[in-house]
Amino acid sequence: MMKRKFIFLLFALCAMIVSAQNTKYVNMFMGSSGDNGQLAPGATVPFGVICVCPDSDPNTHAGYNYETTKVTGISINRLSGVGCSGGGGNIRIRPLHPSKELHINKKTERAVPGYYATAFTNGIQTKLTATNQMAVEKYLYPKEIPAALWIDFSSCFEADATYEYSQAAPTILEGFIHAKTVCGRGMYKLYFSLNTDKPFKLKEIDGEQPCLDFGNDVRKVEVRIAVSALSTDVARKECARWNKYSFNRLKKNSYKEWKELLATVDVKGGTDDDKAIFYTSLYRACLSPVDVTSADGRYLGTDGKVYRADGFRYYSNWSLWDTFRTKFPLLILLKPGQMRDIATSLLHLYRTGKKDWATLDESTPTVRTEHAVILLLDAYRKGITDLDFNIGYAGMKEEMERLLMRKPDQKMEAACDLWAMAQISEIMGKKEDAILYKERAERLFEETWKKEFMNIDASYEIMKGNGLYQGTRWQYRWAAPQFLDKMIEWVGKDTLCAQLSYFFDNHLYNQGNEPDIHVPYIFNRLGAPEKTQQLVRNLMTEPMIHKYGGNAEFKKPYFGKAFKNHPIGYSPEMDEDDGTMSAWYAFGALGFYPMLVGDEHYELTSPLFDKIVLRLENGNKLTIQTVDRVQKDMPIRSVTFNGSKVENFRISHNELIKGGKLIFNY
């Protein structure tokens, strides 16, 4: 018996050691160069409000640009891989007078999950870490440079913020900033408490940024900036919570959070680059939404009122037009407890006031909230059944009446929302509503698809043709997999499969934007699973021809990989979009994908790795394994789950989370 216990403990210890190594694969600089992802290597915790990082000059949407050494300073927040001018970039600190240039010494730059450090070419060093709502910044000065910090309270990636501040103590500044969200579609207000470990003299000169002067004898300064959407008092208390924790302790805590999160998935096989892209993708998928709940359990509603979060944590910072497709399905799989809180937050968002983009009373920078009903249905279908839809049902109904339907793509997306709303109504026992929304969805799809997308002609290849948003008619043709059976009925299965083959053979697919990223998996449903397997593998690992960027057709097609373990981590103009593209890659690597969000089934494809182990939150373990695969592009012969054959290359989420072995035979 003792021998058995020893062996068990030994295996458990080995598993912990292997999992602890997963963080080493995260490439914090992947996708941080130019317009190839729009990402940053900032210090943050999972789903943290703070992401503290240098801002490049000129900057990108996330503030940081790997290929640029010149920086304007270090700001406390940013969104990951989003469009327009990005979001955040607030409370920017500069450890050198603004009249003098500040350049990163690239040889000294280092970043791991939860920590960033670099030296500047003038000898000043900075080290950065974070808690959920507090940036921690350490500055080390050479003897010849006096310790001083210049603060730009107006800094914001979207437009200058308005602000107020005052000195509350010899080591404390407090106030607020009021800034625009992404694309200028809304506003957020952050109260802050800025604390230093040494007293400073506040210098305020007209036309210049306020300066914190620490005197000639100080060589090290630590700054802590806590924020809250509620009040300076809450921000002050948030800062005080961590008084007993040193910089190194906070750094270790942040790293530990990431280590534990990434330990939920272990892989064997594949190349080091495969592992780096995979674990970096898991990391990127867990940056948002962010937990804005105060320590005493309160949050700011989008109606400007303060509420108590009873029995859940309140999340903000949305980019749902992108992320409902992949990121949230991934979180439902890996973090269902957290997804319950995220879904509950969305229901309360409907209650307090939800716009398609943002309100004037946001808690953080945010982007878009369309298709929340599909996300909520997906969570419910995949086992998060203790959601109180009554909280947001009135708001959902109101949203269904104002869905945009001016353009063909809007009509296709509206049909998908109505489809989801019909099912939520059915779940709630509202039969009449369910029938109404189902009929509206089916009628709208039929009218739109038959008129705009059924009869193919040369205009289908034109980006933004017929007013489409960031896509072509070819790409939006497949945008509503909810109605795939109707497409098959109207066109014929063989014809539709041939048209889909033409779509890919002629490079009309766009991996660089969201409307068609599910389309490789449609081959599964058309009886050609080997094409899904080949396409997904090639898109993940091989150089391919890419004709389209985010908003236009390239003058010359780009030939290369869409995903690379490199600062130029994505194809040109491919925004990572707040975890969307990362989650797309992660699902492909796992060997299954949520082609139809709102349905519990996954489409199977060939896993990237030879063996994958998922430690599910319910305590079960799912092992995914390949058998007799001697070449990476071999087609799958059959799939079994716990010994039973899986039919049609589809499997349900609710079966997978029971745990067991998913075996791919070649």
Segments and roles (model prediction):
Residues Q21-F328, I332-I374, R381-L404, P408-M412, ...:
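Accessory carbohydrate-recognition regions in carbohydrate-active enzymes
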Residues T448-D457, I462-K464:
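Long, well-ordered, tryptophan-enriched scaffold segments
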